[in-house]
Amino acid sequence: MNTWFSKSEKMTTKPFLETTKYIQEVHLDVSKYHDLNKQLQLLKLTKQDLAILKQLQPYTKDLIPTMVEQFYASISLSPDLMHIIEKTSRIEKLKITLNKHLSDIFNSRIDSAYIEERKVIARVHVRIGLRSKWYLASFQSLMSSFIDFIQTIEMPPREMAQAVNAFSKVINFEQQLVIEAYEHEEERIREEAENVK
């Protein structure tokens, strides 16, 4: 487990989260996507959750690089995944992309641009042959890194749980976007192959 703060700065009962202070800085608008509105309702992903992540944004200067390193360390355990990556890109370039991707999460602006960017990433992964199960499994590394990180911040256990829940909801939402984009792209590729026959 990484330690971003000293032991004296750890868990307390003093409130830490101030979502009302950050709620005006977040943006949640998926009105162009009827199904996504339903998905957000099922997840109970709200502006309140985004405000929690926004408040944590200043702390992510050290967190995000750690998440990126741990993410690629877990991927490197699979020779097949490394072969796909090395065949199509460079790890350093992908690390920069993931760094931006994670920064966007803590920027707490979920809108059309955010959604379309995630869909593009998923389509690229389909085209390079990265199967959805590997992409989805890699999200666990991000979740584990976040949980380790949140335990280093001085806040009541209840608020830690709220922060983990907020991050988990966004990650789950992203996984749903990825699965849907994978399905659409795989269907498009199948249709193209059938048209060639």
Language model features with spans:
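Structured interaction and signal-relay segments at domain junctions
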Residues: 71-72, 76-106
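Short, charged/polar micro-motifs that form catalytic or ligand-binding hotspots
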Residues: 54-61, 84, 88, 92, ...
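Residue-level detector of well-ordered alpha-helical segments, enriched
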Residues: 59, 63-67, 71, 94-98, ...
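Long, amphipathic alpha-helical coupling/dimerization segments that relay conformational signals between
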Residues: 2-31, 42, 47-48, 100-196
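SIR2/sirtuin-family catalytic core signature
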Residues: 37-40
